[in-house]
Amino acid sequence: MGTHEYEDDPRNETVLISVNGKLLPRSEAMVSVFDAGFLLGDGVWESFRLHEGKLVFIEDHIDRLFRGASEISLDPGKSRNQIMAEINRVISANQMHDQVHLRLIILGA
């Protein structure tokens, strides 16, 4: 399988996604085409795994996210603790525990 391919996961059909703090079904989780992140590529993201209830290397991922945001003068808009609370809220709302891939995206406004 190539790097741009993925195996379909039936859990994705009912997944809730946080967009600006609102938990939305996948079909409603959208970003405006006028968003700076979409128009200008103004944003940062990190991808991480949930394995046996643990977020693997989460501190490293959050550090890298904040460094990347700083490098492009992007204010994440939330503290590390607030971001972690939102990640945990998404995990809880989706009853996630293992073999989960999460992506955190922060876009410019």
Show which residues each predicted segment covers:
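Conserved alpha/beta cores of soluble small-molecule-handling proteins
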Residues: 1-109
